[in-house]
Structures are given as C-alpha cells and as structure tokens.
C-alpha cells in the first residue's frame, strides 16, 4: 500500500466533502493532528475507524486502501491485488 497516495486521496475526499481536518477529526473522535499525519502519508487510519471514515468520505474500504476511486468493472481486480499486497506486508 502506498501511504502517500492514500493520504492524498483522503485529503481530496475530505475537501470534496467540504470538511476541514478539524471537522473530520471531530466526527471521528480523534485529533486533527492524526488527520494531518494521514494526509501527509506518515501514518494510516486505525482499522477501528476505517469504516466510519469511509462512510463520511463516501468511499469504500477498497478505495481507501488503494488510494483511488474504483469503478465497478475493476473492483474484483483491485480486491485481489489489495489482498495480495496485504499478504506481503
């Protein structure tokens, strides 16, 4: 997984949702510093809040972990690649 790409994607989706880092952090019950670290690719969101984060940003977990919007026709291929990447880590 490319943390920098994922971070940029989170930032893009947050801005599309017209949320500041602080507003997103408040919705998730975390600090805006955590959001900043995600968006700079320094850390990843904790698995315990990924579903809520995805719901707020209007994306799937697969899209979050791939760092891009996924069309339905490429969904199965992306799922398989994500599983392979996770197995390597």
Residue ranges and their predicted role:
Residues 9, 37-40, 52:
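Alpha-helical transmission elements in cytosolic ATPase-linked domains
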Residues 1-16:
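A short, Lys/Arg-rich alpha-helix, primarily the initiator
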Residues 18-37:
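Short alpha-helical DNA-recognition segment
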Residues 67-89:
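Short, charged recognition helix plus adjacent turn
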Residues 11, 22, 51:
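Residues within the helices of the helix-turn-helix
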Residues 14, 25, 54:
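The alpha-helix within a helix-turn-helix
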Residues 48-63:
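DNA major-groove recognition helix of helix-turn-helix/homeodomain DNA-binding modules
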């Amino acid at each position: 997984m490319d943390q920098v790409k994922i971070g940029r994607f989170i930032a893009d989706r947050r801005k599309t949702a017209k949320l500041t880092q602080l507003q997103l952090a408040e919705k998730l019950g975390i600090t805006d510093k955590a959001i900043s670290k995600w968006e700079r690719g320094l850390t990843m969101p904790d698995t315990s809040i990924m579903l809520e984060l995805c719901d707020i940003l209007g994306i799937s977990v697969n899209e979050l972990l791939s760092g891009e919007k996924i069309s339905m026709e490429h969904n199965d291929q992306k799922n398989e690649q994500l599983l392979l990447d996770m197995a390597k880590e």
